[in-house]
């Protein structure tokens, strides 16, 4: 009998470095990371503290080590839900989704036996959502 895989289907990941989307788009409310000490960062919404995260939130190699410790063979990666930004302008959310999806796709391509990726889409605009969903499929999510 074949050995069964242990798959963690509910995990979240962020890019280690998130651009200043507020400056890029011209309005506030977007998350960025404040790396205030090694292996630890504050998720900030503008200047307001949102949540503390550890390196396993952005470092796939740390995740692989933790998965090995817990006998998890594969993780399904998705962005942290606050990053969806459904309140933002649809075109900006598309741009943000593409950034996040490219990040996850890069991890999946580098470690295809360890990670599966789920994409984010701009749900406030069905046509843009379909456009990004189709792109997610093309990039391996």
Walk through the language-model features, giving the residues of each.
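Helix-coil boundary/capping segments in enzymes
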Residues: 1-141
